[in-house]
A protein has these predicted regions:
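Extracellular/periplasmic Venus flytrap/periplasmic-binding protein
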Residues: 183-231
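Segments of small-molecule ligand-sensing domains
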Residues: 295-398
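Gram-positive cell-envelope targeting signals
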Residues: 1-31
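Extracytoplasmic "Venus flytrap"
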Residues: 36-56, 60, 64, 71-82, ...
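Hydrophobic alpha-helical segments within soluble ligand-binding/sensing domains
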Residues: 139-169, 278-298
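An alpha-beta-alpha
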Residues: 57, 147-202, 302-330
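Flexible loop/hinge segments that line or gate small-molecule binding clefts
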Residues: 115-139, 263-270
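Periplasmic-binding protein-like
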Residues: 39-40, 92-101, 118-122, 229-240, ...
Length: 398
């Protein structure tokens, strides 16, 4: 009987040691695992848009050290992304981040071709469209929140200019340099105007499209044209510093101010820059890389609002951030107002796309939307979907 007990104990110990040994072997294998992460950029560090993504890549490098090797392709024009993505696959990338909206169709196609590689499309909107691929994902921060806060800052400056007699309420006009008449751009400038009108209800806006994401001369020329039309605060959804330089160099009779995007323009426009907003891409990218390292599904690891293969978040998860406030130029009390507005957005106490406005689809004037009922931006997609021009308060410059 004792012999049976001894054999049983020996057998049990042997099994335990075997299990522990296997666990340690595989755990150590995963702990020592290294992967490659690829990044495809439409520009380089000279443009605010790409520089912002590069900050997120640097955050990945800092977070993972030798465990993750990052590889980047710069100045990849929309339409030329196939070769760059194929090169990243050939170089052994386990996860690839494509960072310009125009890349999405080719990126999804290549995801189907390379099922062992994870493809993450920033600003994309096609992850949940057929065919849905397990290795193709879209993500974006709810930047309309940041645009709204930027608009509040602009509104406070307009109010200050009205109160000190620099302009009248009728002159409370914003200008906006937009790249394309896409939902992403329209949603952004609408939120910006609505933020301003929460402070100055008489504020209106004029929009000038460049029809390119990044062209310094076109963006500067657009901003100059808006200033000539009487706009006193200029903002942008474009990639260069052209609007900032236009504001700083203007000799208009009325002072002109700037609200930026993606990158502070305080050095280029120290006397006109107010504030800016940006998407913080680092949380998604770091968590997606962690998911690949841990061999887990990205949507099970990234913290945000998950909708199928798509994830988004706003101020609540630090996916949207305000850039530095130029307190020398901003109206008194702006810093406190920013903090209060962000808190209200986090708590759902502000519904941005709501009010006594009628929006008109620029591609189909019979398609209108009454904002009295509110528009739930990002309800089903991290990419913006609001695509209506507000009647009577927004003009599109021809």
């Amino acid at each position: 009987m004792k012999r049976i007990y001894v054999i049983t104990i020996i057998t049990a110990c042997t099994m335990i040691f075997a299990v522990v040994g296997l666990y340690n072997m595989f755990w150590k294998k995963d702990a020592d695992r290294t992967i490659k992460a690829g990044f495809v950029y439409v520009g380089d560090a000279s443009t605010a848009y790409t520089s912002n993504f590069m900050d997120a890549q640097e955050a990945v490098d800092n977070a993972f050290g030798d465990q993750v090797h990052t590889i980047a392709k710069y100045n990849v024009a929309e339409g030329a992304e196939r070769q760059s993505i194929e090169e990243l696959v050939a170089e052994g990338c386990d996860i690839i981040f494509a960072t310009s909206y125009g890349y999405e169709n080719v990126t999804k196609e290549l995801a189907g071709k390379y099922p062992d590689v994870q493809f993450c499309m920033a600003t994309g909107d096609n992850a949940n469209a057929d065919p849905v691929l397990d290795n193709y994902h879209t993500f974006m921060g709810a930047i309309y929140e940041g645009r709204y806060v930027s608009g509040v800052v602009a509104g406070m400056k307009l109010q200050e200019l009205i109160e000190n007699g620099t302009i009248t309420k009728e002159q409370a006009r914003l200008g906006y340099v937009g790249a394309y008449p896409y939902a992403e751009v329209i949603s952004g400038y609408t939120a910006f105007l609505l933020g301003a009108r929460s402070i100055v209800p008489e504020a209106t806006m004029e929009v000038c499209y460049t029809n390119t994401w990044s062209n310094y001369l076109k963006e500067k020329k657009c901003a100059q044209a808006l200033i000539e039309d009487g706009c006193v605060i200029i903002s942008q959804h474009s990639d260069t510093s052209g609007p900032a330089v236009a504001c700083e160099q203007t000799d208009a009779d009325i002072p002109v101010y700037l609200v930026g995007y993606n990158q502070s323009m305080s050095e280029l426009a120290p006397t006109t820059y107010l504030i800016g907003a940006k998407i913080n891409w680092a949380p998604y990218m770091q968590q997606a890389v962690q998911a690949v390292l841990d061999r887990k599904k990205i949507e099970d690891v990234v913290v945000g609002k998950v909708n199928g293969q798509d994830i988004g978040a706003g101020f609540d998860e630090n996916w949207v951030q305000m850039l530095e406030l130029n307190e020398v130029v901003a109206a008194e009390g702006t810093k406190e107002k920013i903090a209060a507005t962000i808190e209200q957005l986090k708590n759902g106490r502000i519904e941005v796309f709501q009010g006594t406005y009628i929006g008109v689809n620029p591609q189909d004037e019979s398609d209108t939307y009454d904002l009295k009922k509110g528009y739930p931006e990002n309800a089903k997609s991290s990419a913006p979907t609001f695509y209506y021009i507000l009647q009577d308060v927004i003009d599109i410059k021809e």
